């Protein structure tokens, strides 16, 4: 009888735990995806902060010339970064237990893999958590669908691109100047500005900003007055009110006359779907462009495509871009310290201590 009661208590404890995990009454919803999201994001954040502040230099190029990225090794907030794993590691999985010592793991940039893989796992679980909460509240799943765009972009630069290039050392450094370094080198090696998917992505991001500004300004300009002239118009809105807070007919009429009639939405639902769709599709296409260039399916190359009747090249803008690409690629050449974002530190370590004896 006692054993039966213990089994019931155990089941009851598990049921209470499940109920707490999936409860929508908690201040912050946890969910089953949150069970994995919370530890992975906490791990990624903790290791990132520690590495950004105190990690020793990393042999990113695999040429025994470590590059310093942490604050304690001479960087500031702008130049600091978590340096990607060494080219000597390639795309091998490199957890702490695969290294001979902690010093070796740090020297080869192990923290970068740890941060990136935990971060990508965490944000993927965040997508699932958004879907899970929407499902339990009876909402549609579009919030989680929209968040797949930035997650796809992060996965492209942190995971897909290193896999395509054959080494995590080609991944984007976790820092401000490291991000710019990555962008310049990416342009030099892949001509991303001439990739149609990236161009569509730029249209998506800038277009989304424009549409957001247009929508916000139109709504703010056509608010239904519920307050006196001496009060802020914002006080005229009560959270949860059923009435419209702005006059969509006035906004539609204004914008239709400003541009032309069919440039303006007359359906609030389709308008907001469009506002969500435009930047999301743009960022999807940008992530797809990086993922294709990871395997060297690069941007268009129109270099020296215009010649005169004598066969002489007439330089076009494409040739100017090509010259800039060559300059950036040369400046980033391995073991040539003329690129200001590469902060080299420490003496080069000899690979062979003695020269081999050659007989004959």
Swiss-Prot record:
Q: Which residues does this entry assign to the site Cleavage?
A: 344-345
What membrane topology does the annotation report for this chain?
Multi-pass membrane protein
Where along the chain is a quinone bound? 215, 264-265
Give me the comment on cofactor binding. The D1/D2 heterodimer binds P680, chlorophylls that are the primary electron donor of PSII, and subsequent electron acceptors. It shares a non-heme iron and each subunit binds pheophytin, quinone, additional chlorophylls, carotenoids and lipids. D1 provides most of the ligands for the Mn4-Ca-O5 cluster of the oxygen-evolving complex (OEC). There is also a Cl(-1) ion associated with D1 and D2, which is required for oxygen evolution. The PSII complex binds additional chlorophylls, carotenoids and specific lipids.
Q: Which UniProt keywords apply?
A: Calcium, Chlorophyll, Chloroplast, Chromophore, Electron transport, Herbicide resistance, Iron, Magnesium, Manganese, Membrane, Metal-binding, Oxidoreductase, Photosynthesis, Photosystem II, Plastid, Thylakoid, Transmembrane, Transmembrane helix, Transport
Q: What is its EC number?
A: 1.10.3.9
Q: Where are the transmembrane segments?
A: 29-46, 118-133, 142-156, 197-218, 274-288
Q: What is its main location?
A: plastid
Q: Where is the site described as Tyrosine radical intermediate found in this chain? A: 161
* Binding residues annotated for chlorophyll a ChlzD1, in chain numbering: 118
Q: How is it modified after translation?
A: Tyr-161 forms a radical intermediate that is referred to as redox-active TyrZ, YZ or Y-Z. C-terminally processed by CTPA; processing is essential to allow assembly of the oxygen-evolving complex and thus photosynthetic growth.
Residues holding [CaMn4O5] cluster:
170, 189, 332-333, 342, 344
Chain positions of site Stabilizes free radical intermediate: 190
Give any extra note attached to this record.
2 of the reaction center chlorophylls (ChlD1 and ChlD2) are entirely coordinated by water. Herbicides such as atrazine, BNT, diuron or ioxynil bind in the Q(B) binding site and block subsequent electron transfer.
Annotated protein name in UniProt: Photosystem II protein D1
Q: Which organism is it from?
A: Pyropia yezoensis
GN (gene name)? psbA
């Amino acid at each position: 009888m006692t054993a039966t009661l213990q089994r019931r208590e155990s089941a009851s404890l598990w049921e209470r735990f499940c109920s707490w995990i999936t409860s929508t009454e908690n201040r912050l919803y946890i969910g089953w995806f949150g069970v994995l999201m919370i530890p992975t994001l906490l791990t990624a954040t903790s290791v990132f902060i520690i590495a950004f502040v105190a990690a020793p230099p990393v042999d990113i190029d695999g040429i025994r010339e470590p590059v310093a990225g942490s604050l304690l090794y001479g960087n500031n907030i702008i130049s600091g970064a978590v340096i990607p794993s060494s080219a000597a590691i390639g795309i091998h999985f490199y957890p702490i237990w695969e290294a001979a010592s902690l010093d070796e793991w740090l020297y080869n940039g192990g923290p970068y893999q740890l941060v990136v893989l935990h971060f990508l796992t965490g944000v993927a679980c965040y997508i699932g958590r958004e879907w899970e909460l929407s499902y339990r509240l009876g909402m549609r799943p579009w919030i989680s669908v929209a968040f797949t765009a930035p997650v796809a972009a992060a996965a492209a630069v942190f995971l897909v691109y290193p896999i395509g290039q054959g080494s995590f050392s080609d991944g984007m450094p976790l820092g401000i100047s490291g991000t710019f370094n990555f962008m310049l080198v990416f342009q030099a090696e892949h001509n991303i500005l001439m990739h149609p998917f990236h161009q569509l992505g730029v249209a998506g991001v800038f277009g989304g900003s424009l549409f957001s500004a247009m929508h916000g300004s139109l709504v703010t300009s056509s608010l239904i007055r519920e307050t006196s002239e001496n009060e802020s118009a914002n006080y005229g809105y009560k959270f949860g009110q059923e009435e419209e807070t702005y006059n969509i007919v006035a906004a539609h009429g204004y914008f239709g006359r400003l541009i032309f009639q069919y440039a303006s939405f007359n359906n609030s639902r389709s308008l907001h779907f469009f506002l969500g769709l435009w930047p999301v599709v743009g960022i999807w296409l940008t992530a797809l462009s990086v993922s294709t260039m990871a395997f060297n399916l690069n941007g268009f190359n129109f270099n020296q495509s215009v010649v005169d009747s004598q066969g002489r090249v007439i330089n076009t803008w494409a040739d100017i871009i090509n010259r800039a690409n060559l300059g950036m690629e040369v400046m980033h050449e391995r073991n040539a310290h003329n690129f200001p974002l590469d902060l080299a530190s420490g003496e080069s370590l000899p690979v062979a201590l003695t020269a081999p004896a050659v007989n004959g």
